[in-house]
Amino acid sequence: MAHYISLFVRAVFVENMALAFFLGMCTFLAVSKKVSTASGLGVAVTVVLGLAVPINNLVYNLVLRDGALVEGVDLSFLNFITFIGVIAALVQILEMILDKYFPALYNALGIFLPLIAVNCAIFGGVSFMVQRDYNFPESIVYGFGSGIGWMLAIVAMAGIREKMKYANVPAGLRGLGITFITTGLMALGFMSFSGVQL
């Protein structure tokens, strides 16, 4: 149990997708203007990561890995296309659910919801799972931990950006300029976790 808690904390803080690996920055910067929208996207990314990583773990270990289907047959060259297909299918299912049951959030996310399918944070989580050879329970913990870490980062950024509306920011830094600086400072804060051994 301690191993899974350690993996979860490492995925949320030490190896944060947004602030340690800078994955998913396009949606991170574009949707982090309001806390409500950022938290909605954060939940959507957490759900997709939490499902995509373990499902792709099963696909990789049962179908694509060397000798998984037939001894001596290695289908791992199909990793990327298969992982992208699974992620795209999950995003489509999530999009249909949000459209039917949460139309306000669906409209607030707009074009960024389909872009979750090509969000590099999700593909990065799946790639790290394969690279680190996580088993199925580890992939569940890592997927949800990575999603919660990304959601923590985007909600914190949205809260800071809402407060910065009332700050006296120099004209040349307004908009994305101060957002990039703030993201860098947040990343420096998360770097303090890098020495933690779990």
UniProtKB/Swiss-Prot annotation:
Per the annotation, which location comes first and is thus the protein's main one?
membrane
Q: Report how it sits in the membrane.
A: Multi-pass membrane protein
Transmembrane stretches, by residue range? 11-31, 35-55, 77-97, 110-130, 140-160, 176-196
GO MF terms held by the record:
oxidoreductase activity, acting on NAD(P)H, quinone or similar compound as acceptor
* Broad EC category: translocase
Q: In its UniProt record, which GO terms are filed under biological process?
A: respiratory electron transport chain; sodium ion transport
Gene Ontology CC terms, in alphabetical order: Gram-negative-bacterium-type cell wall; plasma membrane
Which EC numbers does the record give? 7.2.1.1
One Pfam family name from the record?
Rnf-Nqr
The reaction(s) annotated as catalysed by this protein in its Swiss-Prot or TrEMBL entry are: a ubiquinone + n Na(+)(in) + NADH + H(+) = a ubiquinol + n Na(+)(out) + NAD(+)
Q: Which UniProt keywords apply?
A: Cell inner membrane, Cell membrane, Ion transport, Membrane, NAD, Sodium, Sodium transport, Translocase, Transmembrane, Transmembrane helix, Transport, Ubiquinone
Subcellular localization: Cell inner membrane
Which proteins does it associate with, and in what oligomeric form? Composed of six subunits; NqrA, NqrB, NqrC, NqrD, NqrE and NqrF.
What family does the entry list?
Belongs to the NqrDE/RnfAE family.
Annotated function:
NQR complex catalyzes the reduction of ubiquinone-1 to ubiquinol by two successive reactions, coupled with the transport of Na(+) ions from the cytoplasm to the periplasm. NqrA to NqrE are probably involved in the second step, the conversion of ubisemiquinone to ubiquinol.
| UniProt protein name | Na(+)-translocating NADH-quinone reductase subunit E
